[in-house]
Each structure stands twice: as C-alpha cells, then as structure tokens.
Amino acid sequence: SGKKKQKLHLWRKRDIQKLCEDRAHRNGIRVSRVSARNTSRLACDGSGAVVRNSENHSLCTFRTGKQYNCDLSATYNIGARYFIRELLKPLPETERSSLEAKVPVVKRRTSCVYADLRKLYVEVNNLKTA
C-alpha cells in the first residue's frame, strides 16, 4: 500500500542520513542540516520556479530559458542556504537586520537560492568596507 511505501521511504532516508552523519563525524567532518524544501523547484539563478522537462525529469528550464540539471540547481540552493545561515549567525542584531532589509528574501530560508547568497555576500562586503 502507499502508506507502507511512504513509511519505508522515510525510514530509508533517515537511515541513510544517520549513516552519513556517523561516517562524517568519525572522519572529523562537521554536519549541518538545511531545509531542502523547494530547492529543486526554484532556479539557482533567482529567476523563480523551474519547469521540468516532460521527457527527461532530471532536466528543467529556468524562466530565463536556460536548461539545467534539477539536482545540480538544488545542490547550489542547499549550499546557499547553509552559507546564508553561517554568514548571518555571528553578526550583531543591528547588522543582521540591516542586511535582511537590503536582501529581504534571506529572512525566509525556504525560498533562498544561490543568487540570494551572492547578493548577500556583496552586501556583507559593502558593510565591511563602510
């Protein structure tokens, strides 16, 4: 049944995550969880939602017309969400608020993409030079 398959899928996913975390820790690698929500649906270039290729589901088309691998775009977005969090975490509240005002999308991490990280990085550097 569908419910059993879903439970099995979640169990396998958790098992794989746990195995990867254990091996990473054993090798001295730091592990951090990031929300993967919408990472495949949103284009890493910031152009919005992607359209999946009906013949090859691993390919998608951005609004700009560029064709890209969905998993690669999602990987960029997942990495961006991690680095956005790490860039903002050590900052005092006033600086963080200032950056969030300049790049408002970083407030809501589930919609952050690689292009937002690039904008945030520019603004962080502008703050440092000011």
Named regions from a protein language model:
Residues 1-130:
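Positively charged, helix-rich recognition surfaces that bind polyanionic ligands
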